Amino acid sequence: MKKIKNMISFVDNVLVKFRRVFINILTVLFLMLITLSFFYVMGSLFESDKVETEDQVLYLEPNGVILDKAITRNEPFEEFEIFGNSTNQIELESFLKVIKNAGADDDLKAIYVNVDDLSAYYTSALKIADALYEARENGKEIIAFTSGLGTTGYLMASQATEIILEKDSYESVLPFGFSRVRQYQKDFFENIKVDMNVYAAGDFKSGPEGYTRNDMSETDKLAWLEFVTPVWEKYKSKMEAGRGFESGKIQYVGDNYHLLSAENGGNDNETALAIGLVDKLMSKQELRNYMIEKYGSKEEYERPEGISGREYLSTLKDRHVSNKKKRVQEKNKIAIIHVEGEIVTGNIGFNTAGSRDIVKNINKARDDENVKGIVLRVNSPGGDVYASSMITNALEEFQSTGRPVITSMGDIAASGGVWVTTTSEEIWAEETTLTGSIGVYSIIPDFSPLENWVGMSYDGVSMTKAGDVYDLRRGMSEELNNQFRENTENIYKDFVTKVANNRDMDFSEVLKFAGGRIWRGDTAFELGLVDKLGSLEDAIDSMVTKLELEEYKAFSYNNEIEFEDYLNSLTKDILPVQIQGLLNKISGLNRMFLSEKDRFVVAYCFDCGFRNFE
């Protein structure tokens, strides 16, 4: 008995000491955080607000994702990155503003740009490429340095005066165009004895094909090729113009790269130099010396004196580069409501458009009598039907006050991203916007064959027949199967009806370009799916004209993410890419199968993803 007491006492002492050590460690970490916060705040208070631009080189080294509206963190120390810049967000408008102003700024010696770590969809990338080309045409020297670029990265870098490739890099420059390869799992689910019950409305709604096929359908190939081929032509044209190539060279490089590489001993960097994709090969140290010799002094600087994009942005006062009218009248406000990312219920997060927060923003605009109209900015592949309906309901309530809503489509406004536009008086899209995908589907997995195979079963009693036939644990009943099918078809009809009413078309007319098929913005304009082609700025100007305003202010509500969600995103970002992909799939399945209420149907565009050798 004494030995047992001694053992318990020993364990208790160990636990007490461990607890003390753990608490001490937490205390030290907390004090370090407070100290860092203090020095950061004091540094911010005493640092000079004056940013010198004369005889400077502007260094643009964006690291992150291009989007319309950045997400801020709802936390006390939101300026601190815990695991580094894993969730960097670059607002397109601000980035373009820096490039356009820098191109016309005679004080700046040159622009240095490195887009290796910049991720942008093609409409945004084309805008950035155009801005760089315009700056170069204005006489500004642009030096692009890279350790390796794919198609979209090279599109932007090719607008520079000079492209320098890191000679020791193993990535090189490979503008091979767009490629779309999906994983197909039909046989996999059959082999593990899981029945994937798929209900799709729309012949071109290819999202669930990964569960029902072992290869890409002809309709999927057709829709994607018709969408992306003109985009690829536009990319090639701009790359060739930027580099001074004859027409057809980029296509030739992509089709014959294996031969071109063989001519240069299989060395990708030497191949890029030989065929003119880049101008020079340099190490980073050689680049530093080159920049000092070209733009700097002989002093021991790490690089010539320069300023960052963030510093340069702080010197620019106006929010919009191309203001045609003043936006200073607080009594005439235009609210820009962003729907960015996958549409889900709940709060806004990284790459998710949470309907709860979006509805809150719409209601803020509704309750503010100084807000004269809403410009809905959509950059979304769609998502949950219920969440999309929550957004349109809030917009309709805003419109019931007699104030208008105009939509501006960004890179993507597909499926549920179209659904949320169906109350708008006017819809704008970019030429290369990916839109359409008017269709819905639901996926219900049935694990009963697997459970039976391993020796598991469910049995019990129920007070009603429905209690038995609607219990998925017992397998997919005929009654439940029919209901899911009818539910999907009914939501599809509702979707088409909403579009038809908004576009002032017959139901049958909309069916011709619905069916889940994706369209480019210019084709959508020809079909009548959108009213006009243009940018967010054009949509705002259209709202100003509609309201007959002389002075106004266009503004956006902040998109805040809860600190817990931010920590979750950081934790996921440090995981290997393969694990991240698996978690995304599990998360998607969770939203489909374990969502609130009985919402099994989604309006999402799985077709909106592609690989461009980034």
Indicate residue ranges for each PLM-predicted region:
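N-terminal Lys/Arg-rich, disordered targeting/topogenic segments
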Residues: 1-22
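Intrinsic disorder and flexible/low-complexity segments
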Residues: 2, 317-370, 487, 558-614
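Tryptophan-centric aromatic hotspots in well-structured domains and transmembrane helices
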Residues: 12, 419, 519-520
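Hydrophobic membrane-insertion alpha-helices, especially the h-region
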Residues: 23-41
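Aromatic-capped interface at the extracytoplasmic side
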Residues: 40-54
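Cleft-lining beta-strand/loop regions that shape enzyme active-site pockets
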Residues: 51, 56-182, 324-450
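Charged, glycine-interspersed solvent-exposed loop segments at helix/strand-loop junctions
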Residues: 186-292, 448, 452-527, 531-533, ...
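C-terminal long alpha-helix characteristic of the crotonase
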Residues: 241-242, 260-261, 279-330, 441, ...
